[in-house]
């Protein structure tokens, strides 16, 4: 029950409880689902390719704030999905993973271990200690959590086995990186001194086995699996961020004829289609209502 005070701002009611905030967040993502999951990654792919090919002027080419903003928007379905599940334990796991991701990236940049010698090829925004992008968790966390959620959906009851769940998630994380890194190298996000698989050293994937294992274990420790299953059941957009990933990086790999990474992106897309969660009604979205009004 409200306090009687006016809690409305520009037609938006300020939530009084976490339940209210969850409902409003869900409604916002649902109403903008197509724009977030499809339009943003397609526009992102075009602008990144235009930047890499020298078709955009300097103020726009690889603009780090545009990149961060677009990435953050594409993460909204995942953030909304896990928002009601973040309790003290999950919060501690996220803090630990944040510190770990900054730490291992800093070691990687300065020593070449565990990912191989590399440098950033473009400005990725504010840097922590001058070496690590401050926005790193926005890029890294979702890759692992999306893999974890996809495994829960695809394996069903088989995911109750800790060994099966964790190994399957780690394999999916590696699949994600086999799509991401070749595309990122192709557009010049980062440059490795020992290019091997589409410009990426095999050592990088060994490094991802390490960092991915730690991240998967922390997510498995921090989040209630039964709660995640319920949320996945009730929240059809929860894996839309992975849809965005497939469209964005699959498109970039296709442009540069990176056929193996593109095929792996298609495999991820097939896994998403298998979950039968993305045949949504455009008339439920703001974009659809604007087009068909």
Curated annotation (Swiss-Prot):
Regarding protein family, the annotation reads: Belongs to the BABR hydratase family.
The biological processes this protein is annotated with in GO are:
carotenoid biosynthetic process
Which coarse location class applies to the principal site listed for this UniProt protein? membrane
Pathway(s) this gene product operates in, as recorded in its UniProt entry: Carotenoid biosynthesis
EC id: 4.2.1.161
Q: Name one Pfam family in it.
A: Caroten_synth
Name its cellular compartments: Membrane
Knockout or disruption consequences: Cells lacking this gene accumulate BABR.
Cross-referenced InterPro entries, in alphabetical order?
BABR_hydratase, CruF, CruF-like
Stated role: Involved in the biosynthesis of the acyclic C50 carotenoid bacterioruberin (BR). Catalyzes the reaction that introduces hydroxyl groups to C3'' and C3''' of bisanhydrobacterioruberin (BABR) to generate BR.
Coiled-coil features, chain-numbered ranges: none
* Keywords tagged on the record: Carotenoid biosynthesis, Lyase, Membrane, Transmembrane, Transmembrane helix
Q: How does it sit in the membrane?
A: Multi-pass membrane protein
A GO CC annotation recorded here is: membrane
Please list the reactions this protein catalyses: bacterioruberin = bisanhydrobacterioruberin + 2 H2O
- Name used for this protein in its record: Bisanhydrobacterioruberin hydratase
Record organism: Haloarcula japonica (strain ATCC 49778 / DSM 6131 / JCM 7785 / NBRC 101032 / NCIMB 13157 / TR-1)
A molecular function (GO) held by this record is:
hydro-lyase activity
Annotated transmembrane regions: 36-56, 66-86, 89-109, 134-154, 171-191, 199-219, 254-274
